[in-house]
């Protein structure tokens, strides 16, 4: 995520910045009170329940009309589409929901956790400890993310401090916000020393030989939250039975995934029928 994307996302989470989009969302809802389920997602495993439920027609089994999920490449694009009503259900980083709710008064509701843990700190092959990140740059998916919290805890536990300076000192680590889909390429180009993010990008880096997993976030903070599924508050308030049916499908998707992990991985990949991700 470049500075322009960051500023755009920050603006979306202020009252003034989000007002036109919220008005557009209200108009959409007035015109389509029974709108179909429109899912927006990033190509990361955090979207699993949404995509599994779509692929296995679990929404239809609950009587919910659903359109094909729409892939977005950045959090800014995803959040803008949600606030404006282009999509009416997305997964977002859990701390981001607090920022959205109290920063812009965005009328959203958290329906469920998408998963626990499931992320990792991946570094260049020559780095063997957290302490070796001193003087280097590490990418995070967003400031308001569990990834940022876990990483800063790890760094401080190893005597390092965080900075945004372009020239970090030997006991400092520069953190930058970057879209997950850009992280592997940045690591391969040695523009960053590491990144902390959800799968599949940690596995992609290892498979390409450009990085290795140094720590799993679940080993630092057991069963931590990561992404959550959110809906528009007006859907929850005005058609609660519809939201319940959607939630039922998502729960069934979670349960199926727990018992069919290999099948779920194939389903989510570019080899799957839905081709939900480019991986």
Language-model-derived ranges and their functions:
Residues 5-25:
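N-terminal export signals
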Residues 11, 87, 192, 248-255:
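Solvent-exposed alpha-helix faces
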Residues 31-177, 189, 193-203, 210-223:
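Short, glycine-/small- and polar/acidic-enriched structural segments
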Residues 44, 73, 145, 181, ...:
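Soluble non-cytosolic domains of exported or imported proteins
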Residues 120-122, 228-231, 235-236:
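Short glycine- and hydrophobic/aromatic-rich loop-to-beta-strand nucleating segment
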Residues 129, 236-237:
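Short beta-strands and strand-coil junctions in structured, solvent-facing domains, enriched
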Residues 237-279:
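Secondary-structure end/capping motifs
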